[in-house]
Curated annotation (Swiss-Prot):
Gene: ahpF
Keyword Oxidoreductase listed: yes
Organism from which the protein derives: Bacillus subtilis (strain 168)
Purpose: Transfer of electrons from NADH to the respiratory chain. The immediate electron acceptor for the enzyme is believed to be ubiquinone.
Location within or outside the cell: Cell membrane
Catalyzed reaction equations: a ubiquinone + NADH + 5 H(+)(in) = a ubiquinol + NAD(+) + 4 H(+)(out)
Record protein name field: NADH dehydrogenase
């Protein structure tokens, strides 16, 4: 039995939603992965009379495709889609059977209009929380458009293929045999990358907003909901809705929710925002902000939006270590997400740069996968919580180096080592390894506001207790501000504060 009793009980409910007959075409060998895949497929077929199984010769073995009767959909799983990809399998079964996907009709129409042949391949790991978004988006595109096919490839089942392509980060997507992209991508982002996204003309007729929120993370979502509930015209411009929360695996300090994952919380935020009359403009990057009679926000696509007030909630991103080799070997051994990319370094030696909570958590996670972890901390002592340090020092395959100034990440086609300077002795040292995980904190996404609003030396927007900035009518919230702490729950509170501050400003002006 591949599926445990709890999963089978949940799956039984979804099986009732299958609308039409589907055929699982299976290509299997004598290896253990093939046997496990066959067991999974047979178990699925036993749970619904609408699922049948056929043997087939597919491009990869082991693999299976999900098809309509008499029609190949192009949806293929190479490997066993369990772990984080089990949801991708369930959605594929439902959508291939005829159940409509839960996306805007406008997006569905964009997918259906795509012409030409597009053969996508996504390389994933079953522990990657960013991968399902990509897999599910590409599967959906394959179901909607016969010109598109997609194969999900589990890197653990196809190690030789992954190594031959020098793939060291997931998800990594190939299109028609060429590299297409890596990292989390939503359906809208994929369409934009293919040249089928939203252009400036679609913003031309928008009336001025009362409040325009720039950023779609926890602070932005909170601000938008609070202003919309006041009955004023609200818009949200977001580069990707959910923000950095999408890259957070485990969340256990969001009060009233014992434990959740970033993507789940981001989905809940978006669902909540959509309950209100809020104009959400996703996949849009802000370029310039200017105050005239109204605020004018210029987007990268050339569109200009106008608003009486603006709330900046652009968040923050992972800080780069800014040494030679970091950008050259990004996704070729340099990584920022241990949950996603850790499994690709199984049995190898890696370094973690950073001794704060995120760095030590990464080192602990990686120690269970890789051969050895070297932690490099610039300061004389680690900054992580004591409970994390205690756990770290109990691990036999971890070395901690303090007073270490990273000088260079070395490599050829991929990372082969890291060079650092001992800050006490001045001695330069080199460690041979295959991966470097950078975990040194955050930098606010405020560079585009240079000269527009007062910021501190860290680039954080300075705000008062109402969320107001140095510019009347301009407010800010969340990790892009000079808040004392960067936490999801604090960002949400600051978003509400900025929203109420903006509403009060509108009343008085």
């Amino acid at each position: 039995m591949v599926l445990d009793a709890n999963i089978k009980a949940q799956l039984n409910q979804y099986m009732q939603l299958i609308e039409n007959d589907i055929v699982l075409k299976v290509s299997a060998g004598e290896d253990d992965t093939s046997k496990d895949m066959l067991a999974l497929v047979d178990e699925l077929a036993s749970m619904s009379s609408k699922i049948s199984v056929e043997k087939a010769e597919l491009n990869r073995t082991p693999s299976f495709s999900v098809n309509r009767v008499g029609e190949d959909t192009g949806v293929t799983f190479a490997g066993i889609p369990l772990g984080h990809e089990f949801t991708s399998l369930v959605l594929a079964l439902l959508q291939v059977s005829g159940r409509p996907p839960k996306v805007d009709q406008k997006v569905i129409d964009q997918v259906k209009k795509i012409s030409g042949e597009y053969h996508f391949e996504s390389y994933i790991s079953l522990t990657c929380h960013n991968c399902p978004d990509v897999v599910q988006a590409l599967n959906m595109m394959s179901v909607l458009n016969p010109n598109i096919t997609h194969t999900m490839i589990d890197g653990a089942a196809y190690k030789a293929e992954v190594e031959s392509k020098n793939i060291m980060a997931v998800p990594t997507v190939y299109l028609n045999g060429e590299s297409f992209g890596s990292g989390r991508m939503t359906l809208e982002e994929i369409l934009a990358k293919m040249g089928s996204g939203t252009d400036a003309s679609e913003f031309a007729d928008k009336e001025p907003f009362d409040v325009l929120v720039v950023g779609g993370g926890p602070a932005g979502a909170s601000a938008a909901i609070y202003t919309a509930r006041k009955g004023i015209r609200t818009g949200v411009v977001a580069e990707r809705f959910g923000g950095q929360v999408l890259d957070t695996m485990s969340i256990e300090n969001f009060i009233s929710v014992k434990a959740t994952e970033g993507p789940k919380l981001a989905a809940s935020l978006e669902e909540h925002v959509k309950e209100y009359d809020i104009d959400v403009m996703n996949l849009q990057r802000a370029k310039r902000l200017e105050k005239k009679d109204l605020f004018e926000l210029e987007l990268e696509n050339g569109a200009v939006l106008k608003s009486k007030t603006v709330i900046l909630s652009t968040g923050a991103r992972w800080r780069n270590v800014n040494v030679p080799g970091e950008q050259e070997f990004k996704n070729k051994g340099v990584a920022y997400c241990p949950h996603c990319d850790g499994p690709l370094f199984e049995g190898k030696d890696v370094a973690v740069i950073g001794g704060g909570n995120s760095g030590i958590e990464a080192a602990i996670d990686l120690a269970g996968i890789v051969n050895h972890v070297t932690v490099l901390e610039f300061a004389p002592e680690l900054k992580a919580d004591e409970v994390l340090q205690k756990r770290l020092y109990s691990l036999p395959n971890v070395t901690v180096v303090k007073n270490a100034q990273t000088k260079e990440i070395t490599g050829d086609q991929s990372v082969n080592g890291i060079t650092y300077v001992d800050r006490e002795t001045g001695e330069e040292k080199h460690v041979e390894l295959q991966g470097v995980f950078v975990q040194i904190g955050l930098v606010p996404n405020t560079e585009w506001l240079e000269g527009t609003v007062e910021r501190n030396r860290m680039g954080e927007i300075i705000v008062d207790k109402h969320g107001a900035t140095s510019v009347p009518g301009l407010f800010a919230a969340g990790d892009c501000t000079d808040s004392a702490y960067n936490q999801i729950i604090i960002s949400m509170g600051s978003g509400a504060t900025a929203a109420l501050g903006a509403f009060d400003y509108l009343i008085r002006n």
